[in-house]
Amino acid sequence: IAAFMVMLTPWNESKLLIDPMCGSGTIAIEAAMIGANIMPGINRNFQGEELSFISKDDWIQARKEAIEKENQKEFKIYAYDIDPEMVKLAKSNAELAGVDHLIDFMKSDARKFHSTNEYGFIITNPPYGERMGEKEAVYELYKDLGRVFRRIPTWSVYIISSLENVEELFEKK
């Protein structure tokens, strides 16, 4: 879903991208892989490699061609989370994916986000409460985020959420 979400936007590696509630880092990692043109699973082995009618040389050549198409340009994606343990996990996941050099992870509260950049992209999956008591806190978070996003009106903001009436919570018309 994260890769699809990034691909649905006009973002590319030359544009600023921030995930202010990165959790385990999935959106930032997928965006880094898309920006660097890294094929999914490029570093994995597949059962298909054992098929007798496809030579090992063909697999090696296909992998080599995919790696040669990777984008070597340097760019940065910024990913924040309020929970330092999630930041640590996200960094570890980015290392495993081989894109840790493309993402700056930091502990930060999304409700305090601000930027002097005229334009950028926010792509995020905010938390949502399922238990009683959490719902009100989540609604308040979404309202706070709506205020934050209204301060950056020239930015493109993409949110994925299972909450109904997200636009109302963000007080977006």
What are these regions (language model features)?
Residues 2-114, 131, 137:
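Conserved S-adenosyl-L-methionine
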Residues 95-111, 117, 150, 157-158, ...:
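Non-catalytic accessory regions of SAM-dependent methyltransferases
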Residues 127-129:
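Specific lipid-exposed transmembrane alpha-helices and their immediate membrane-water interface residues
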Residues 119-125:
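Short SAM/SAH-binding signature in class I
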Residues 74-76, 80, 84-88, 132-173:
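Conserved Class I SAM-dependent methyltransferase catalytic core
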